[in-house]
Amino acid sequence: PCIGRCEQAPAVAVGQHPVAYASCESVQAKVKAAVTTHTPSGFIDRAAYEAQGGYRLLKQCIGGEHDVESVIKTMEDSGLRGLGGAGFPAGRKWRIVRNETAPRLMAVNIDEGEPGTFKDRWYLERDPNRFIEGMLIAAWAVGISKIYVYLRDEYHGCRAMLEAELSALRAHPPYPGMPEIH
């Protein structure tokens, strides 16, 4: 199956460890060393993200400095669209879901299998808390009670890193009443 690393071709997975720009020698070395897992390094963790002003917009939304209608209107006016193939306008999607009766749930699909799908992993491996903050702003604007995150199996290291960041977030949520994240 595709391992979502087109930008590192040829790429091979040894167990769940990606080998970028693979050669016979580099793959054999990973096999001999029994390197079968991978955790991204050098990403912006929560402390660094907050030091750069991260979670400020979320806290402003929760604190009432921004109202739901203006945030959804900003999304609609931005022209931002989903990149999963259909190109559905994100602001319209937020409004449609917001207008449905509760409970409202959110499914975050970090891999829809489209060409260029490695973009999701590329951003997430570098700046996971920006993704988390955006997800929580969307949840606030739409009135979400539970969030379900899907990440493809081939992104094992990314999943381990994201699980650690989400665990830290649950231990010290940026606001009371944060939605459950699964």
Tell where the protein language model's regions lie, with residue ranges.
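Feature of Fe-S/electron-transfer and energy-metabolism proteins
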Residues: 1-182
